[in-house]
């Protein structure tokens, strides 16, 4: 190098610089041109790498948008997926625009673009499947609405049909009661005629008729109502004879010819017996025919209600199975739904067979059958549509994976091409530098030494980057010459390489996140299945407890929000049934308590009646004393002042006694009215027994010879019921007479009280009106004697009321026993400790 320096030292500095710089400039120019070419190639490759990285991120967004579309298939989510697909198509087109058809990676980009177009087609298929599913779901919802409406209409119509049959049966029973009233009237007249014929004297005959006149007038009122329209004249004739008989009995003179007239009236009444019995028999025959016609209708109404309930229960189970199927549209759930629909069809066929001739059954059966078929067909199509949608989504996901693989392969090809181009650029740069060194070896040794260091550093840095050492620092980036540009281009390459690696790491993280999201979705589906299974098991346990009579068992654990209404409806149904039985128990307890209270009241009434009798005796004695006092007052005018004082005290005591007697008679009258109501209940019971005996006789007559013995027993029961009814009517008549007598006695006692008040006033005036006292005393003595007679009669009636109160007490205990039996029937159900303890408390009382 010394000789070069000596050679150059002979030239001027500018010439030397020019001589030294010219070869250096030439070599640098060659290296610069080579660097520019390499930098352009690298920038193009890095732009393509950026587009590929953006596409990879975008396809992750596409996959996430497709998952959202599958979970919630809406127009917004569909538009979002297409928007993401359009963005990826634009990115792929931008990457392809930088390549020629023969460039490396062109085939991979074309494959990815074709797969992207296929995804667009599959999205259209998914949307069409969603539209089919929405149509099928709407059809199922519409069919379910028809089923619910038809279910309610069927139950309402069946209940109305059953009620109409019951109404016809009640009408037939009422006609049977009319026949019984007709026969009872004829039997009563015959018995009264026999009693009159067996009289010992005329007075006894009149008393017998007078005693029976109240009941006879009752028959007079009831008979025209009970007779059929064509037999109304018989009722008028019966009423005319009863009025004639009443007029003869009410005749105070009672001449002997009245006996003949009474016998004539009885003869006319006897003549009415046969046509009245014929009318009653005709009514009973008509009732028997009606009962025969109603037997089939009653049985049919029971079967219709039974089949309707079976169909209703099957529909409820089908609705539960349908709810489970809509949450999990699997073949297994569809099979379960089909099984329940088959049960509904069987129940519907049974109802159609039973009630086929009824208009409501045929109309609703057609609607229900059509709805069952529609739900079953829609469920099958839903299973297929759900499977197709899953397949289409999986195919789209596979195509996205294929696109990712193609883009990754394209990125690898671009990476390899960039490496080769980098090596080519390095070789060109080294060749240019060697050539420049050779050309300027002598003349530009110093300049070569000056340029060799930076170029060597850049070369080494490029080798390190090509070898994967991305942490290598790029020197000379701040130079303004071509070396600086090469350093900056190299730094951009390093930065893009780092970004690509970071992008690959983020893509891996997003793939892991997508896998975790799929696992969460599967866990959510498993949780929903468990919630449905729990709800079904809880309902099954509740129904089993209800079947065993445990009405206190409810479902306390809440279901899932979508299923919790089943739990609340079930609990409400159990609570309603339990409350109904509790109401029955409460009513039975009230009847039980009322029966005991009636018995105790009757017992207390008997005791008070005895006390009243004693009080009446004391009152009679007091009245006798008053009579004696008044007589002595007339004879002993001289002792008027002392007598006035004593009479005033006696009058005050008598006023108190009369007030007590009036109040006691009021209580007796109220008790008699209550006893009358009890007698009406007993009469109704006797009528029901008579009705049952008559029905038994009709059935025995149908049985022929085999039913004769049963017919005899039924006749005996019927006669016993008639005697019971007759006894009840006699008691009612006695109570009516007692009530009338008590009312009369109360009036007399009230008059007595008024008289005693007048006595008190007159006693105050005795001092100045001694003579008037004597006259008034005689008048008062006469009045008080009449009062004494009335009190004696009242005492007899009071004794009779005591006997009736004892009979009422016995009837009340019988009523209480029947209420106890009803309580035992209700106690078979488990209605809770509170209700049970209340029942035991009532029984203990």
Curated annotation (Swiss-Prot):
Taking every annotated instance into account, which residue ranges of this chain make up the domain HAMP? Answer: 451-502, 530-582
Please name the InterPro entries in this protein's record. Answer: HAMP_dom (IPR003660), MCP_chemotaxis (IPR051310), MCPsignal_dom (IPR004089)
Residues annotated as transmembrane: 17-37, 430-450
Q: Which residues form the Methyl-accepting transducer domain?
A: 587-816
Which CDD domains does the UniProt entry name for this protein? HAMP, MCP_signal
Instruction: Report how it sits in the membrane.
Output: Multi-pass membrane protein
Subcellular location per the Swiss-Prot or TrEMBL entry: Cell membrane
A GO term from the CC aspect: plasma membrane
Q: Which UniProt keywords apply?
A: Cell membrane, Chemotaxis, Membrane, Methylation, Plasmid, Repeat, Transducer, Transmembrane, Transmembrane helix
A Pfam family: MCPsignal
Record's superkingdom? Answer: Bacteria
Give one GO biological process term.
signal transduction
Instruction: Give the similarity note.
Output: Belongs to the methyl-accepting chemotaxis (MCP) protein family.
State what this protein does. Chemotactic-signal transducers respond to changes in the concentration of attractants and repellents in the environment, transduce a signal from the outside to the inside of the cell, and facilitate sensory adaptation through the variation of the level of methylation. Attractants increase the level of methylation while repellents decrease the level of methylation.
> What name has this protein been given in UniProt?
Probable chemoreceptor y4fA
Organism the protein comes from? Sinorhizobium fredii (strain NBRC 101917 / NGR234)
């Amino acid at each position: 190098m010394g000789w070069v320096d000596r050679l150059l030292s002979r030239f001027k500095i500018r010439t030397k610089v020019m001589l030294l710089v010219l070869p250096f400039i030439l070599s640098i120019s060659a290296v610069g041109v080579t660097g520019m070419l390499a930098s352009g190639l690298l920038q193009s490759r890095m732009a393509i790498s950026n587009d590929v990285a953006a596409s990879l991120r975008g396809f992750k967004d596409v996959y996430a948008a497709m998952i959202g579309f599958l979970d919630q298939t809406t127009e917004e989510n569909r538009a979002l997926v297409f928007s993401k697909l359009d963005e990826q198509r634009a990115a792929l087109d931008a990457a392809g625009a930088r390549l020629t058809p023969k460039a490396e990676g062109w085939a991979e980009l074309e494959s990815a673009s074709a797969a992207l177009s296929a995804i667009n087609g599959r999205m259209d298929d998914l949307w069409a499947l969603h539209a089919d599913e929405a149509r099928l779901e709407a059809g199922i919802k519409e069919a379910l609405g028809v089923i619910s409406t038809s279910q309610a209409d069927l139950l309402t119509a069946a209940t109305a049909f059953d009620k109409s049959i019951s109404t016809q049966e009640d009408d037939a029973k009422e006609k049977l009661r009319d026949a019984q009233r007709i026969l009872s009237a004829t039997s009563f007249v015959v018995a009264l005629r026999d009693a009159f014929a067996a009289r010992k004297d005329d007075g006894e005959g009149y008393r017998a008729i007078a005693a029976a006149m109240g009941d006879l007038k009752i028959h007079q009122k009831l008979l025209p109502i009970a007779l059929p329209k064509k037999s109304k004249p018989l009722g008028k004739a019966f009423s005319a004879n009863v009025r004639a008989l009443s007029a003869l009995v009410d005749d105070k003179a009672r001449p002997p010819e009245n006996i003949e007239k009474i016998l004539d009236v009885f003869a006319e009444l006897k003549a009415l017996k046969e046509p009245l019995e014929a009318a009653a028999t005709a009514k009973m025959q008509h009732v028997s025919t009606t009962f025969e016609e109603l037997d089939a209708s009653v049985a049919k109404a029971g079967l219709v209600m039974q089949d309707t309930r079976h169909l209703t229960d099957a529909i409820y189970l089908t609705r539960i199975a349908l709810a489970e199927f809509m949450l999990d549209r699997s073949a297994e759930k569809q099979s379960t739904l089909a099984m329940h629909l088959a049960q509904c069809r069987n129940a519907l066929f049974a109802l159609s067979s039973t009630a086929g001739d009824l208009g409501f059954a045929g109309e609703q059966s057609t609607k229900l059958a059509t709805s069952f078929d529609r739900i079953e067909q829609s469920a099958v199509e839903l299973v297929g549509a759900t499977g197709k949608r899953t397949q289409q989504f999986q195919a789209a996901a596979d195509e996205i994976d294929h696109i990712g693989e193609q883009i990754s392969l394209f990125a690898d090809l671009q990476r390899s091409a960039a490496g080769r181009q980098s090596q080519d650029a390095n070789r060109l740069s080294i060749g240019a530098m060697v050539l420049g060194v050779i050309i300027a070896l002598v003349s530009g040794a110093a300049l070569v030494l000056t340029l060799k260091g930076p170029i060597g550093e850049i070369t080494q840095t490029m080798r390190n980057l090509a070898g994967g050492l991305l942490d290598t620092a790029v020197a000379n980036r701040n130079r303004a010459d071509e070396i600086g540009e090469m350093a900056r281009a190299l730094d951009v390459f390093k930065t893009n390489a780092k970004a690509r690696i970071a992008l690959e790491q983020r893509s891996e993280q997003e793939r892991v996140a997508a896998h975790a999201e799929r696992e969460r979705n599967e866990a959510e589906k498993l949780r929903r299945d468990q919630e449905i299974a729990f709800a079904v098991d809880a309902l099954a346990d509740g129904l089993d407890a209800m079947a065993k009579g445990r009405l206190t068992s409810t479902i306390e654990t809440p279901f899932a929000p979508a299923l919790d209404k089943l739990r609340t409806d079930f609990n409400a149904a159990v609570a309603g049934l339990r409350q109904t039985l509790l109401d029955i128990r409460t009513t039975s307890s009230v009847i039980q308590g009322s029966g005991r209270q009636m018995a105790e009241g009757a017992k207390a009434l008997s005791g008070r009646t005895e006390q009243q009798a004693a009080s009446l005796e004391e009152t009679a004695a007091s009245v006798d004393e008053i009579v004696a006092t008044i007589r002595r007052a007339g004879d002993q005018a001289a002792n008027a002042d002392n007598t006035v004082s004593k009479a005033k005290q006696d009058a005050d005591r008598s006023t108190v006694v009369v007030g007590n007697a009036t109040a006691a008679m009021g209580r007796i009258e109220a008790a008699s009215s209550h006893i009358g109501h009890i007698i009406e209940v007993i009469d109704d019971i006797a009528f029901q027994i008579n009705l049952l005996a008559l029905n038994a006789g009709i059935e025995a007559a149908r049985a022929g010879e085999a039913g004769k013995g049963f017919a005899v027993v039924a006749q005996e029961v019927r006669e016993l019921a008639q005697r019971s009814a007759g006894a009840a009517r006699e008691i009612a008549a006695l109570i009516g007479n007692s009530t009338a007598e008590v009312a009369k006695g109360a009036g007399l006692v009230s008059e007595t009280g008024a008289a005693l008040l007048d006595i008190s006033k007159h006693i105050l005036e005795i001092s100045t009106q001694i003579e008037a006292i004597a006259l008034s005393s005689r008048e008062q003595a006469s009045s008080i004697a009449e009062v004494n007679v009335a009190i004696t009669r009242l005492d007899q009636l009071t004794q009779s009321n005591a006997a009736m109160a004892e009979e009422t007490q016995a009837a009340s205990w019988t009523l209480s026993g029947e209420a106890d039996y009803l309580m035992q029937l209700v106690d078979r159900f488990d209605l809770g400790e509170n209700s049970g303890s209340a029942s035991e408390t009532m029984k203990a009382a």
